[in-house]
Amino acid sequence: MLRTLSTSEFAEAIGISESSARRLADSGELRIRKTKGGHRKIPAAEAIRYAREIKATVVRPDLLGLSTNVIGNQPIEADSRSQRLLTALTEGHYAEVIGLLQALYISGVSIAEMCDGPIRFAMNAIGSAWPQDKRSIFIEHRATILCVRALSFLSSWLAELHPPPPFLRSFHDSSMSYTHT
């Protein structure tokens, strides 16, 4: 089941007033679902889409289901993105890798830009440590696994934000089920 937020949770997550959140929902700028009782519910994926679109500072990432490890009130400086990712990958800190990539995505960086920028820089730096550092092969393999896991996590996250069109849904659903005969 997909996580939903009340208007007060959404407002707290991005640091706006609850009345502003209700106005956004009522004006259609924010896609919502209404409960049988008439309460506005905002899918977490929609809250993330909106925060990214307006480049909002995410004050409470935990309310959006995001990592609290890196995302916070401070934007990530462009120069430090690659270095922070390199450190997280080298030290094997998966939660920090996820948090950094989530923070980059929320700030408007595309997956392609992440791969061509900070991920490429980090993987090149890790790969160039060999043959001087014999541990570098292990570190490179672990970093590759962490990147694949983090990007896989982000792709599942993006699937919520941008579900496949109806004509592909049945194909996608059927291709994911395996049966033994």
Question: Where does each model-flagged region fall?
Answer:
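Conserved mid-sequence domains
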Residues: 156-181
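Residue-level marker of alpha-helix boundaries and capping positions
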Residues: 12, 91, 174-178
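Long amphipathic alpha-helical segments
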Residues: 20, 29, 33, 37-160
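Short, contiguous strand/loop micro-motifs
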Residues: 8, 72, 170-174
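Polyanion-binding surface elements
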Residues: 1-20
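Residue-level preference for nonpolar/small residues embedded in alpha-helices
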Residues: 3, 16, 96, 121, ...
